[in-house]
A protein has these predicted regions:
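S-adenosylmethionine/decaboxylated-SAM
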Residues: 1-153
Length: 153
């Protein structure tokens, strides 16, 4: 549901004594309302989250470069490659960019598949693996998580 990933991230920050702010971008107003309600019901102050209504491709370039510890991408898979470079630009050294649901039935996408989603997932995997600024890993949890830490450069 709306806000589930955000709740986990907020709980993780609170569990470590972090006072960070969760920034979430979504184009759907009802998802924002649901997330805000979920965060409030879980006991998080309104100032712990910043919900931005808009298309991520329009919003990401306006965010502070080098100002984020984590960029979590959970969007239409066909758009993942569009978010890659913008997401990396937002990371502090040591920060992590993570792409959700990158596996197909627990395995990398079949190279024979030529549909838009499969091609987009392969494209972002190649981009992450080939980027010298990053140290990538593929975690077979849930639908698969492609994560990469930004190196100190």
């Amino acid at each position: 549901g709306a806000g589930v990933s955000g709740l986990y991230l907020l709980r993780g920050m609170a569990g470590r004594g972090e006072d960070g702010v969760l920034t979430s971008i979504d184009i759907e107003p009802e998802f924002h309302r649901a997330a805000r309600t979920a965060f409030s019901e879980a006991g998080f102050q309104a100032g712990r989250s910043r919900l931005i209504l808009g298309r991520a491709v329009d919003v990401l370039p306006r965010l502070t470069a080098g100002g984020y510890d984590l960029v979590f991408v959970d969007a239409a898979k066909a758009e993942y490659a569009h978010y890659f470079e913008q997401g990396v630009q937002l990371l502090r050294p040591g920060g992590v960019i993570a792409f959700n649901d990158v596996l197909s039935k627990g395995k990398p996408v079949d190279p024979v598949r030529r549909d838009t989603e499969a091609m987009a997932l392969r494209e972002v995997a190649r981009a992450v693996a080939g980027d010298e600024r990053l140290m990538p890993t593929l975690l077979p949890v849930g639908g698969g998580l492609l994560a990469a830490a930004r190196l100190e450069v």
